[in-house]
Amino acid sequence: MSEELSKKHTTRLNKLQKRLRREVGSAIADYNMIEDGDKIMCCLSGGKDSYAMLDILMNLQQRAPIQFEIIAVNLDQKQPGFPEHVLPAYLEKLNVPYHILEKDTYSIVKDKIPEGKTTCSLCSRLRRGTLYGFAQRIGATKIALGHHRDDIIETLFLNMFFGGKMKAMPPKLLSDDGANVVIRPLAYCREKDLEEYANLREFPIIPCNLCGSQENLKRAAVKDMLNQWDRQYPGRIETIFTAMQNTAPSQGVDREQFDFVSLTRDPNAPMRGDVAEANLPAFDFLDIANSGRIDLDAAKRIDIVNTYEV
């Protein structure tokens, strides 16, 4: 690599590194993901996202005003062709505590699920159960997963289109049994930034041989849709994520999130909101039911039809 290219490489890496660290730090602070004395079980798959997550968390660990542990964990599901030597060699160089769990969930899924049927549900349950159980065994207080902002948005649309739910991936989650807290430190990070960062840092990426399941095909379709939107309307993805952080249950239709049934008017409420902001003089209201007129203030009456006629 020439000196000029090396300088550009370093400059770009430093700039990207600062941005990602800032975004991870903001997500951690906003959702109180990491607290003093935490033992973080950092789940590694060998992909770009989990490598970046571990790298950034280890850097923050050195700079943070609080003390927390990091333990890297990989689940070897015995998928054919998985290079078992890559992660141990990498983690040894980092001098980070780690565990490689071996559980042949691949064979279980192949045995239980008929050919051609989606394996995602069973596979994710087995993986989640193994990781949750191991977290409790080592006394981990938080489980860190490498999902990023794009994953969160894609999951929202997947659930909307194919599940009929407004549901995504929360940056922080309490497991159903209440025993584990899951955090997603990359929640504010863009996938394209993580991909570039992984290339610049030369992480030993383990290729992901996708199973070709229906869920993965659907996710790919949603990703293509969002990428097309982003090309056509730059900034739309950022706006979608901002909208997810600014929900208004009272302006929706979900009766579980807002008590529409009990809504009643307050006859003594002061004039405010839309009525107060309108600041229009009084005018005649047409009483359709009685074909009559209700005079409010004859002195300030205006002809509403003529005034607003186009």
Curated annotation (Swiss-Prot):
Residue interval(s) of motif PP-loop motif: 45-50
Domain of life: Bacteria
InterPro entries: Rossmann-like_a/b/a_fold, TilS/TtcA_N, tRNA_Cyd_32_2_STrfase, tRNA_thiolation_TtcA_Ctu1
Binding-site residues, [4Fe-4S] cluster: C120, C123, C211
Cofactor(s) named in the record: Mg(2+); [4Fe-4S] cluster
Catalytic activity: cytidine(32) in tRNA + S-sulfanyl-L-cysteinyl-[cysteine desulfurase] + AH2 + ATP = 2-thiocytidine(32) in tRNA + L-cysteinyl-[cysteine desulfurase] + A + AMP + diphosphate + H(+)
Keyword Cytoplasm in record: yes
Subunit composition and interactions: Homodimer.
Protein name: tRNA-cytidine(32) 2-sulfurtransferase
Organism: Shewanella baltica (strain OS195)
